[in-house]
Amino acid sequence: MAVITKIDTFAAIGAGVIGSGWVARALANGLDVLAWDPAEDAEMQLRANVENAWPALERAGLAPGASPARLHFVPTIEACVADADFVQESAPEREALKLELHERISRAAKPDAIIASSTSGLLPTDFYARAHRPERCIVGHPFNPVYLLPLVEVLGGERTAPDTVDAALGIYRALGMRPLRVRKEVPGFIADRLLEALWREALHLVDEGVATTGEIDDAIRFGAGIRWSFMGTFLTYTLAGGEAGMRHFMQQFGPALELPWTKLVAPKLTDALIDRVVEGTAEQQGPRSIKALERYRDECITEVIAAIAAVKARHGMRYED
């Protein structure tokens, strides 16, 4: 099966937070972008999101020809995907909706176009069941903000051709991303399963009055979060084992896994818990608008990525190492 390996035109189906992030990343890489979303104010919100993201993208570095002027908002799905080399769907996480969307997308798209979904946990075998030419359909699950964070989880369904996955990995790399091939179809894939465990424990700590939302965020951002930005969980614990490494760590701290510290099951989302979380995060946000916080976040991300890349280069490493 022939699939596209180099793209010039990128189609975005859905223009919410994730979809607009894809649009901004594609524009920053010098592509022509077509976008569609059924919401009445979708085009206005999309252009506002791209405008808010652009200063961070300029700091990170734009490809030749990159411009928000290369974004075209169109009235139908068919107009969006007909001439696209790569289609990225970022619709709400409802399987029935994605089944319907991908039936339409796949019939209107070019035969060799790659079709991807941003789903964070639905399985491609299921929601591509009615797709035309499902061998060119994949999942490309990004992380917010999509235009800055490099990770994208990539996997196919039972009928996806291996060549399609390989081509998608290359295209995402060309967009400045760090694609991670997911070896098996599992709900939640890799990163969100890890984040979900942390999120559940955080909610338990708030619910039981152990800590506020701000204190929990501080525990992450002044502790493990700093290490995680350049050295993940397993390598961090390898160092904790000293010269003997991971085997010593597992022998010394492995029994602690049996201690009943964590809850793991989701807490009941009572009105009281929801109110406590909302009030806590409102206090953290203070008078700053969401757009202002996004700009602050984006500047932090670009500076952190640049700093890590510089240190790795001095140690003879690539950023993705």
From Swiss-Prot:
Oligomeric state and interaction partners are given as:
Homodimer.
Name the record gives this protein: L-carnitine dehydrogenase
EC top class, in one word? Answer: oxidoreductase
* Protein localization: Cytoplasm
The Gene Ontology biological process annotation of the record reads: carnitine metabolic process; catabolic process; fatty acid metabolic process
Name the reaction it catalyses.
Answer: carnitine + NAD(+) = 3-dehydrocarnitine + NADH + H(+)
Keywords carried by this UniProt record? Cytoplasm, NAD, Oxidoreductase
HAMAP family given for it? Answer: L_carnitine_dehydrog (MF_02129)
Which pathway does the protein contribute to?
A: Amine and polyamine metabolism; carnitine metabolism
What GO molecular function annotations does the UniProt record carry, in alphabetical order?
carnitine 3-dehydrogenase activity; NAD+ binding
Q: Where does NAD(+) bind?
A: G14, A15, G16, V17, I18, G19
Q: According to its UniProt record, which protein family does this protein belong to?
A: Belongs to the 3-hydroxyacyl-CoA dehydrogenase family. L-carnitine dehydrogenase subfamily.
Function, in words: Catalyzes the NAD(+)-dependent oxidation of L-carnitine to 3-dehydrocarnitine.
Matches recorded under InterPro entries: 3-OHacyl-CoA_DH_NAD-bd, 3HC_DH_C, 6-PGluconate_DH-like_C_sf, 6PGD_dom2, L-carnitine_dehydrogenase, NAD(P)-bd_dom_sf
Q: Superkingdom, according to UniProt?
A: Bacteria
